[in-house]
Design a protein with these regions (language model features):
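Interfacial/gating helices of multi-pass transporter permease domains
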Residues: 1-7, 71-75
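Membrane-interface helix-loop junctions in multi-pass transport and translocation proteins
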Residues: 104, 111-145, 177-192
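Helix-loop junctions and terminal segments of transmembrane helices
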Residues: 7-41, 94-99
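Membrane-interface junctions at transmembrane-helix termini in multi-pass inner-membrane proteins
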Residues: 81-112, 123, 152-156
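Alpha-helical transmembrane segments of multi-pass membrane transport and lipid-handling proteins
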Residues: 13-14, 36-87, 118-122, 126-127
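Residue-level recognition of pore/gate-forming positions within transmembrane alpha-helices
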Residues: 4-5, 51, 84, 110-115, ...
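Membrane-proximal transmembrane or re-entrant/amphipathic helices at the cytosolic face
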Residues: 178-221
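Structural signal for membrane-spanning alpha-helices in multi-pass inner-membrane proteins
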Residues: 54, 121, 148, 152, ...
Length: 221
């Protein structure tokens, strides 16, 4: 249910993104490198920080939305959410391949990651059960995403915010550990801390929004 919410939201965004990419490609004078670099980095930030905020929220609301007989499944949520995010990002990158007429890469990146997923499922499920299935999904989509990012870096010269990615991975581990081993109050604290971090991560956007609001107020005055 929780991953379906993410998928629904991102599907709507991807439809709009598809239109934007085609318009960008039609305007050949646009800065493709700058446009796609900014779009990819911001998209990863929004999804990454969004899921880190969602995880402690799920911990709190889980008993109210999910029947008590499924309480044991609560531990599987973080890894499955991360797998969903990896899937969404790979789809997002796929739209760029389509818009830039690099469809030839879509097939073999999908086949490679799909093959790896099938292999890892058979290896990990006997060891970790359902958690192994989620992990194999995460591995498959992460490999797909990494391959597509490497290709885009080569073809369009995009540059990734590696500092944020490293920080996100570290924070994701901490938030997941708090979710699995912590109590309700530790997850509430986790939510607050991640929320504060979001203010720093998106400070540039927030400042632009505040400046825009001030300008509108000044014009009305």
């Amino acid at each position: 249910k929780f991953s379906s919410f993410i998928t629904l939201f991102t599907t709507c965004f991807n439809l709009a993104w598809q239109e934007i990419t085609y318009v960008t490609e039609a305007n050949v004078n646009d800065d493709r490198k700058g446009f796609y670099t900014q779009a990819i980095n911001y998209y990863m930030r929004f999804l990454g920080m969004g899921v880190l905020l969602l995880i402690p929220v799920v911990y709190v609301i889980y008993p109210f939305f999910i029947n008590e007989s499924y309480s044991a499944a609560k531990v599987y949520v973080p890894l499955y959410l991360f797998a969903t995010i990896a899937s969404v990002i790979s789809e997002f990158l796929g739209e760029i391949f389509t818009a830039t007429k690099m469809n030839r890469y879509l097939f073999w990146t999908t086949v490679t990651s799909g093959t790896l997923n099938v292999i890892s499922v058979h290896v990990l499920i006997p060891i970790w059960g359902v958690q192994g299935a989620s992990l194999s999904l995460l591995i498959g989509f992460c490999v797909n995403t990494v391959m597509r990012l490497i290709i885009l870096r080569k073809e369009i010269s995009i540059s990734l915010d590696l500092k944020f990615l490293g920080f996100f991975i570290l924070l994701a581990v901490v938030v997941s550990m708090v979710y699995i081993h912590g109590a309700i109050w530790s997850n509430i604290i986790s939510f607050v801390i991640v929320g504060v971090i979001c203010l720093f991560v998106f400070k540039d956007i927030l400042l632009q929004i505040l400046q825009s609001i001030k300008l509108k107020k000044n014009k009305k005055a």
